[in-house]
Amino acid sequence: MKKLVFCDIDGTILDGSRKMEKLTPETLHAINSLRRTDYVVIASGRCMGLLDRQIIDLDPSGFILCNGAYDLVGDQTVFRDSFSKEAVEKIREVTVAYNGFYIFEALNEMYVDSFDSDAFQLFMSGWAKVLKGFEESKVADKPFHIAIIGFCDEDSCQKAGEQLKDIADLARHKGFYSYDVNIKGISKATGVNRIREYLNIPYEDTYAFGDALNDLEMLQAVAHPVIMKNSDPALKTYGFEETGDVLDNGFYRYLLTNKLINPL
């Protein structure tokens, strides 16, 4: 029976915060091996337009994008959902009230309210070249699948999060005053379940690898959840099996040790 492996990107097979910006030969071998014999799905909070070319070039079996709000197997869309107009307006209103920035993501395009705000410069300035300005007249009919909001201080971040928790599901970014803002009830687990059903894979043959709180539901939705040694401490409290650090090819090493792939 084929296995179905879900793999996060940031902190799991890449780590830009620690200058690991290219996939290692071991990771490339692992994903190529799984793609030939089983199924491997890249699971990300990002939209397609924010994925590195090296990730797209992996040509995995599928993608979970926008933390589960847009899910693909090959070229087939198996699930998608978007924010209501009311939710978009509430997220904008609360974020601005606390001097934050917001980014709304469609499948291939991202829109930011201000390139000049202090909060944006603090957290997201490196993304400026791939973002567009949020102009209401131009985005009125855009389907947005996820948002990112960020602030200048902890107090603003916490208060904004409290005001939004009833209309969206928020996942805090480790080490930053910012969140992924997900459609209420949607998570990477949504993609796991839709893709597993589409491919008709038994639960006992499912695996997931992650390192952050936006991976929690995905990890809980599979039979074999695995977290990285460098995971958010909050994720480690759930008792998931742990593999090595991303810098030590933890993803590859787990697959090799458990005989899911052959050595490089």
Task: Enumerate the language-model features and the residues they cover.
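Asp-based, Mg2+/Mn2+-dependent phosphohydrolase catalytic module
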Residues: 221, 225, 229-264
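Short active-site oxyanion
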Residues: 37-40, 60, 144-146, 204-206, ...
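Conserved acidic, metal-coordinating active-site core of Asp-based
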Residues: 98-101, 105-221, 230
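Asp-based phosphoryl-transfer active-site loop
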Residues: 3-19
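Short, structured coil segments at secondary-structure junctions
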Residues: 58-59, 67, 163-167, 221-222, ...
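Non-catalytic pre-domain segments flanking phosphatase-related domains
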Residues: 1-7, 29, 201
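Short hydrophobic/aromatic-enriched beta-strand-loop microsegments
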Residues: 60-67, 81, 124, 225-229, ...
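Active-site phosphate-binding/coordination module
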Residues: 22-118
